[in-house]
Amino acid sequence: RVCTDQACALKGADSILEHLCQHHQIQPGQTKTDGSLTIEYAPCLGLCDHAPAALVNDEAETDISTDLHHYDLGIPTSRVFGNLRELTANCGNGRPTLLAEYGEYSAFQKALSMSPEAIIAEITASGLVGRGGAAFPTGIKWEGARQAPGTQKYVVCNTDESEPGTFKDRALLLDDPHRVIEGMLIAGYAIGASHGYFYLRGEYPYILPVIEAALDEARQAGFIGTNIHNSGFSFEVDVRLGAGAYICGEETALFESIEGKRGFPRIKPPFPTTNGLFNQPTVINNVETICNVPLIIEKGANYYRKIGTDKSTGSKLFCLSGDVTKPGVYEIPFGVTLRELMEMAGGVRAGRRLKAVIPGGSSMPVLPGDIMMQTDMDYDSIAKAGSMLGSGAVIVMDETTCMVRVLERLSRFYHMESCGQCTPCREGTGWMHRMLQRIVDGKGRAGDLELLRSAAGQISWTPASRR
């Protein structure tokens, strides 16, 4: 499965796919007559820092070149940079951090000495907001779930980072799984939950053994199970592997998937804090959000608020990919400019000029490079510039990039990944992609641009996309 989404395309993925097909004498989507090989297009695999990339069965093939005659398959190494190491202190070492190295869950043990109300108050005071894209205040979410009636409550770790250009959660899960587990335990204790779930994206099968091994370590150490360390608090954790649907990154579609149903978003309200997984009160946070929790409980809200800006507190993990010299995960405080971030990353590769940037994942508006270079990397500044911070996936495009081809490629992704629940999106994304293909092929028609605007407007107001 060869990724041909934007980050990999900028590194020559189309040529790699063509080379493979010519070598094996089959076309994309076809299988060799002996059944030994199938070659497929693939949407973003979360390997953008190792572009161009592919999955061979369940193993990652990274930094592919047509010059290579032998490929090393396995687990990708995290490339972690930046001027902070609060969340990424244990990342970038090329292997998972063991419990003996991570420590005895000191933040969780401190949390057990606090009241649930005090924990939620500390999270609220820190200013932590969701890092998956919505930026909803975490403390408010937790308080809503705690106050909701119900004897069975859940904590769900959304590890389905399917937004093209995003790969930070992959690094956290591969390199520091115990930080994620500890954050889930604290969340469970705070809201009164007794069960947690990891929902792992289908393109990350190689992470599953890492999570399972870390959970086994935590169980053997008495941090998961019944009456944990004689505290009266019990908590179990299970893992569910998704099937690769982009829509299951949406929280309620994710619940449907865990429950064994088709991944359709639910109508809101009611919200997950009252009617979530199995219709019970649920806190769902993404990996990066949960990894902030042990830090806040261990060092306090005041320490946390000193990082970042007044309105965007803490650090942020940015995923730099595309036409950048050093792609990878960068942990920086909110408020650092893109210019500073690009300097850390060695600038635009090959000494070219910056043309455009997608600042927060492929569903965010594209901004011109000159505007982005003067923009602070925080929620308010990106919004004022005309886009959104989203998941923090920064896709860099140089002066050689054709923006019409970029749009055509993005439209293909959203056409392929539409959940199909609403007709304007199910059909409209196909119309848009076909029109853009015509334009890219030099066969554009008068009125195409107006039709594109009209279709985009109708899709944006479909019921599911407004939830």
Locations of the language-model features?
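Feature of Fe-S/electron-transfer and energy-metabolism proteins
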Residues: 1-467
